[in-house]
Amino acid sequence: MAEGLVLKGTMRAHTDMVTAIATPIDNADIIVSASRDKSIILWKLTKDDKAYGVAQRRLTGHSHFVEDVVLSSDGQFALSGSWDGELRLWDLAAGVSTRRFVGHTKDVLSVAFSLDNRQIVSASRDRTIKLWNTLGECKYTISEGGEGHRDWVSCVRFSPNTLQPTIVSASWDKTVKVWNLSNCKLRSTLAGHTGYVSTVAVSPDGSLCASGGKDGVVLLWDLAEGKKLYSLEANSVIHALCFSPNRYWLCAATEHGIKIWDLESKSIVEDLKVDLKAEAEKADNSGPAATKRKVIYCTSLNWSADGSTLFSGYTDGVIRVWGIGRY
């Protein structure tokens, strides 16, 4: 019996591209999503046939596209980054923004929480990486001069490795950089991509890092050594990457579908494509009419903490939910 993924349902409330999805680490029945409709939505997962989740709260305040959103480990707060140049911290229970982080001079493209939630990192089109405390004070800026990136910083993530606290960043300068969190000094520059790098993901144990972007190739790196291990061909622009929390799988959101690799065999386990016709027949069209685009593709994705469910956000504003099944 092979394991595969089947479409479990859809979640409709965003009116533009879904840019990011955050899932709680305790596997609670909520997720949070960010969109180019300038809002963040807190969803309650109902797991119904028609709608897998319902919008519980819409968080508004950003004045431009919201590009990224992450959850605190206790699930109480969401952190977002926007093209308005700001980060915001949101109290999910109250549905309000409790803090604004001002300092970037251009669009914020990526945000992340450290493991203990006491530190925040952000990446921007101003070519900097900023480290903040939760009070909204910028503690350190890694700038373009010296060791910093030479172009937009598109993605930034903390490694879950507590022994070697690390920040990983990806950039339009075609590199991935690995930084020591303790002093914000460069540990290694990972070069190998031939086009801009739009996304980076760190494996659950903190040993591996995967990067992808314009060249359609996923590169896997040994984080401790700063060495390239191998590459996987997606043959299409890559918008997002994530590791499964409990299988040796890597998922890529590409312009030609969601590709899932088994990293042991380096083979594709699944290539998920959307059947819009079948979806239209199943839906009762009660949700808001998303912008009509002929070609849609996945722009964001994240696993549930138990690895049973893959949430994927698309250019048409719909979140499609895939579940592990056997066939």
Swiss-Prot record:
Disruption phenotype: Shorter hypocotyls in etiolated seedlings, epinastic cotyledons, reduced rosette leaf production by half and late flowering under short-day conditions. Reduced sensitivity to gibberellin and brassinosteroid in seed germination, hypersensitivity to abscisic acid in seed germination and early seedling development, and hyposensitivity to auxin in adventitious and lateral root formation. Plants show a significant resistance to water stress conditions by limiting water loss through the guard cells.
WD repeat start and end residues: 13-44, 61-91, 103-133, 148-180, 192-222, 233-262, 293-323
Pfam families, alphabetized: WD40
InterPro entries in UniProt: G-protein_beta_WD-40_rep, RACK1-like, WD40/YVTN_repeat-like_dom_sf, WD40_repeat_CS, WD40_repeat_dom_sf, WD40_rpt
Entry keywords, A to Z: Cytoplasm, Nucleus, Repeat, Ribonucleoprotein, Ribosomal protein, Transducer, WD repeat
Highest taxon listed in the record's lineage: Eukaryota
GO cellular component, as recorded: chloroplast; cytoplasm; cytosol; cytosolic ribosome; nucleus; ribonucleoprotein complex
GO BP annotations, alphabetical order: cellular response to abscisic acid stimulus; gibberellin mediated signaling pathway; positive regulation of signal transduction; regulation of translation; response to gibberellin; response to glucose; ribosome biogenesis; seed germination
PROSITE patterns to which the protein is assigned, alphabetical: WD_REPEATS_1, WD_REPEATS_2, WD_REPEATS_REGION
Subcellular location: Cytoplasm; Nucleus
UniProt xrefs under SUPFAM superfamilies: WD40 repeat-like
Oligomer and partners: Homodimer and heterodimer with RACK1B or RACK1C. Interacts with NUDT7. Interacts with GB1, MEKK1, MKK4, MKK5, MPK3 and MPK6, but not with GPA1 or MPK4. Interacts with OFUT20.
Task of the protein: Major component of the RACK1 regulatory proteins that play a role in multiple signal transduction pathways. Involved in multiple hormone responses and developmental processes. MAPK cascade scaffolding protein involved in the protease IV and ArgC signaling pathway but not the flg22 pathway.
Family: Belongs to the WD repeat G protein beta family. Ribosomal protein RACK1 subfamily.
Protein name: Small ribosomal subunit protein RACK1z
Originating organism: Arabidopsis thaliana
Gene that produces this protein: RACK1A
